[in-house]
Amino acid sequence: MMSKEDIKQEFKEMEGDPHIKHKRKHLHQEMVMHGAVASARKATVLVTNPTHLAIAIYYQPDETPLPRVLAKGEGALAEQMMKAAREAGVPVMQNIPLARALMATAAADQYIPSELIEPVAEVLRLVRKMAANPESQP
């Protein structure tokens, strides 16, 4: 019969040291968070659900055939993305239905899903209009 220590040792050998696994997971989360915040700074627009969701969208007609989702964030990450976008001068647009739909169906670093092309295009038109006529902004 195996002792408690033998069982622990066997588990470590099979699954890896829990402390190392925790550290690796933490580092991965930091890398993801840093990447999402950096993507928010490069975005054309950040679509939000006021405080809980943020989706960074990039579109330059001469560079990309369709808008791309650069990154998605929820909770604290979404707040950091919004802060970074504002600091970088990226428009932050509140659109609850679109933010929820993008969060549910779009993948980071992919083109937007075909069913969301029209709503995203409308947001991009509004951003372009605001950029062309800054004195009309609230």
Positions of PLM-derived features:
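N-terminal cationic and glycine-rich segments that engage phosphates or anionic surfaces
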Residues: 1-82, 88, 92-104, 108-138
